[in-house]
Amino acid sequence: MSQLTYLFRTAPHSHSSGREGVDALLAASAYCEALSVVFIGDGVYQLLAGQQTASILCKDYAPMFKLFDLYDIEHVYVCQQSLQQRGLTSEDLLIDVEVVDTVRLQGVLHNSAQLLSF
């Protein structure tokens, strides 16, 4: 059972929740080993490689996702249907993830003691 699950479901850079979620996740990883991270819906765009943020005057926090390995964040799931609906594949993403169907995602969310949504 995962003690904490971080659920990313919003597109990056439209507001600060994505950045705040990554900051909270990295901070929690210092105290908690049982972490899971889930990207669904527009949240899959958080992991999209090649984001150009200079034109919208936003700081690009996408490189922070590459810190997951350093922080031993191993359970990273992406919704297969969300990728397909947006014409994306796992090769379009910044980091290695486990692409799973909605049934598996429901299991991950159900087995979580605490769910934090961003």
Curated annotation (Swiss-Prot):
A cellular component term, taken from the record's GO annotations: cytoplasm
Cleaved signal peptide residues: none
Xref: Gene3D superfamilies: DsrEFH-like
Localization per record: Cytoplasm
Keywords, in A-Z order: Cytoplasm
Pfam family, one: DsrE
Record-linked SUPFAM superfamilies: DsrEFH-like
Main localization (coarse): cytoplasm
Annotated InterPro entries: DsrEFH-like (IPR027396), Sulphur_relay_DsrE/F-like (IPR003787), Sulphur_relay_TusC/DsrF (IPR017462)
Role, per record: Could be part of a sulfur-relay system.
Protein family according to the UniProt entry: Belongs to the DsrF/TusC family.
Protein name: Protein TusC homolog
Gene name linked to the record: tusC
